[in-house]
Regions:
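Multi-pass alpha-helical transmembrane bundle typical of ion/small-solute transporters
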Residues: 1-299
Length: 299
């Protein structure tokens, strides 16, 4: 019972960190562009997180049980590794994929315990992690090219429509993060009403108290994005994460979105994109996974 409470507490802490940190990914653009206020953005993010968790969170059940034995001892180690890695990355101001750290540590712990995870699932995860960024870049690039070659006749009316669509895209991004990343955490913890309630509370706490400093436009740090570009990047990445959720594969929202931002930037030949932040993120994707695996294996 005591170990269960410790595990749930660690799960709550990780949920708080994930919710607050990833709010910039889902609603940072609409808040930063002043389409809506911060608190409205927080409300959209919270509603999206919780809706995704409740409606599709169970989709990650097999992945959670196949990657890590259902032992509160092992689960608590995986969660502790992820929390520690996140705190260190925050102090170093380095981007980090919590999803990849958590998956990597789960695999490392399983192998250390003498259990080989489902190889078919591992291949599917690796394939999705490679294919998703490539597809996100391609979709964003081609979609923006089409819009550039076929500019709207009524610019103001289109801008208003794009603002509304961008809000929808932000909600959908929050929804897929709740279904995938938070759903994976829910199933690692074993699910149930107690765990679900604790996670919902964690979502609210993280979104309200940890989002103020991180609601930044991810796209604007790499590229000055238009409404259309931001909408396409958000929708393409969210759709890919939704597909991964349906397939039962944990996938990082920031991974897909960062790739989508690059695709949008590459579509504009007259404006250069700063590729260094994206290359840094790609490097941390790889490091995050292997760091999680290494720590999970040796602990």
């Amino acid at each position: 019972m005591q170990l269960f409470l410790i595990t749930v507490l660690l799960g709550a802490i990780l949920t708080i960190l994930v919710s607050g940190n990833n709010l910039s990914v889902s609603v940072g653009t609409i808040v930063g562009a002043r389409i809506i206020g911060r608190w409205t953005g927080v409300l959209i993010g919270v509603f999206g997180y919780i809706s995704g968790l409740l409606l599709e969170g169970e989709s990650l059940r097999y992945a959670a049980t196949a990657l890590l034995p259902h032992s509160y001892y092992f689960i608590s180690i995986a969660l502790l590794i992820s929390i520690t890695a996140f705190i260190i990355a925050t102090l170093l101001r380095a981007p980090l994929s919590l999803t990849m750290v958590l998956v990597g540590s789960s695999i490392g712990i399983s192998i250390h315990a003498g259990r080989i995870p489902d190889q078919g699932l591992l291949l599917l995860i690796v394939a999705m992690w490679i294919i998703s960024p490539v597809l996100s870049i391609a979709i964003s690039y081609l979609s923006n090219k089409v819009l550039i070659r076929n500019p709207p006749k009524d610019i103001w009316k289109t801008a208003i429509s794009m603002k509304g669509l961008l809000v929808v895209a932000s909600f959908f991004t929050s929804f897929t993060l709740g279904a995938n990343t938070l759903g994976f955490i829910l199933n690692l913890l074993g699910g149930g009403s107690v765990v679900l309630t604790v996670m919902v509370v964690g979502i609210i706490i993280g979104s309200v108290f940890l989002s103020k400093g991180v609601i930044k436009r991810v796209g604007e740090e790499m590229y000055g994005m238009r409404y259309s570009s931001a909408t396409i990047s958000l929708l393409s990445s969210a759709i890919l994460v939704e597909v991964a959720t349906i397939l039962g594969v944990p996938l990082s929202n920031s991974q897909a979105l960062s790739a989508g931002v690059v695709g949008s930037g590459l579509s504009y030949t007259f404006k250069a994109i700063n590729i260094r932040p994206f290359l840094l993120i790609v490097a941390t994707w790889i490091i995050s996974t292997f760091l999680g695996f290494f720590l999970g294996y040796i602990i």
